[in-house]
Amino acid sequence: MKISEVIEFVDIGAGDGFNMSIAFPLSKSFATRGLLIEPNVKQLEFARRIYKNYDFSFCSEFLDPVNISDILKKFGFLNPTYIKIDIDSFDLDLLRGILHSHILPKIFSIEINELFPPPFKFEVKYKGEIVPCTSPLFGCSLQSVVDLATEMNYSLVSLAFNNAFFVYNDSMRGDLKSYNSKSRLLYEIGFLNRNWRELFPWDIKYEHWLKASATQLDRLVKKHEGFDEARMIIY
């Protein structure tokens, strides 16, 4: 990707467009065209105000794996440079809906559930309705994303605490390294061996999950009060 080209990005779970959003850093560093998707209308209106002079579109529709491709098509983002997903729910199913619709960004990032280290797999599934999820049972594990990424020709290149970054293999530069087969190593580098207790203090009471065996973790998850057998799978 040439730095001089316009970066087209889609921020799914954009919030107010500033805090935890990719819109601000990208717009300050590159020529951008963006789509900010956020169902919280008040937050989206704040984003609309601060980016009124930018080539940004705004969407407050609730997304699901079925309608996501139509929404991206409606706003003209069928070939985006970068897609970010952070909805704290069926994030992986939403990503599947995008990639299986042949919308293949050069880069995507997704928030992972940091309490499930590779090789353990966990995900919240979409079952036809929007149901909020809460810590510690939300989103998906890093390994679950890596499996989908490998299938769709993407490489895991970085993990910044609970945000994983993937690059389409045809866009990989020579200085980038794929961690698809070494996801546990990257998890240790990007999360486990860093100051996560300071940044994620609410995770400390689940620290024993990080050291559990497969059998132990399966039991811990399924007996947790937030576990929903109809929507959550650990495998």
Locations of the language-model features?
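Anion-recognition interface
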Residues: 216-233
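Accessory recognition modules or surfaces
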Residues: 1-7, 164-181
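A conserved mid-domain beta-alpha-beta active-site/ligand-binding segment of alpha/beta enzyme cores
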Residues: 117-167
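Flexible, glycine-/basic-rich loop-and-beta segments that form/coincide
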Residues: 171-200
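Active-site glycine- and acidic-residue-rich loops that bind
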Residues: 84-97
